[in-house]
């Protein structure tokens, strides 16, 4: 599938349709990793069930981290008036999907200067923070962006 064949709204809608309460993120992680691969990124699921991606081969390390778990409960997924609704649309599958598409759009020049690591972390909504704790000792970025909404 070409980069242009993966629609960001449809991709996010698909992620929202996969329930992923804390501790049960594996299916959405696999979906996101597959999407990253379709966009030309190295996409995979790690031992903590984080959805992970990487692009670029440069010396400057950047982490783009969002979480892919949600609080329990269902919100019907719907597109209404140009807005997408569903559990995780804002907190925080939406920000992570935006990060995926931003990374996929990096220029060749940027890919030579940067290595961008994408982390769709598990269990952020739980006290364990399993996903972030797993990657913290493994990634030593120069810069990090956390895709977490604020009140």
Predicted regions and their residues:
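Phosphate-binding glycine-rich loops and adjacent basic patches that engage nucleotide phosphates
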Residues: 1, 14, 60-65, 93-98, ...
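Residues at alpha-helix caps and immediate loop-helix transition turns in enzyme cores, especially N-
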Residues: 28, 76, 95, 128-131
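Generic detector of well-ordered alpha-helical packing
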Residues: 68-70, 92, 124-125, 149
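Short, conserved micro-motifs enriched in small and acidic residues
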Residues: 86-97, 122
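Acidic/histidine-rich catalytic neighborhood of metal-dependent amide-processing enzymes
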Residues: 97-151
């Amino acid at each position: 599938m070409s980069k242009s064949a993966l629609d960001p709204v449809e991709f996010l809608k698909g992620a929202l349709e996969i329930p992923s309460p804390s501790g049960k993120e594996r299916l959405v992680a696999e979906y996101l990793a597959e999407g990253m691969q379709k966009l030309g990124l190295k996409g995979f699921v790690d031992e903590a069930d984080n959805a992970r991606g990487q692009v670029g081969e440069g010396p400057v390390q950047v982490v783009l981290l969002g979480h892919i778990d949600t609080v329990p409960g269902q919100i019907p997924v719907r597109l209404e008036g140009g807005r997408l609704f569903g559990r995780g649309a804002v907190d925080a599958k939406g920000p992570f999907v935006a990060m995926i598409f931003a990374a996929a759009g990096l220029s060749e020049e940027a890919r030579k200067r940067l290595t961008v690591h994408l982390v769709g972390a598990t269990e952020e909504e739980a006290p364990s923070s399993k996903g972030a704790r797993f990657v913290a000792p493994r990634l030593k970025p120069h810069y990090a962006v956390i895709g977490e909404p604020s009140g």
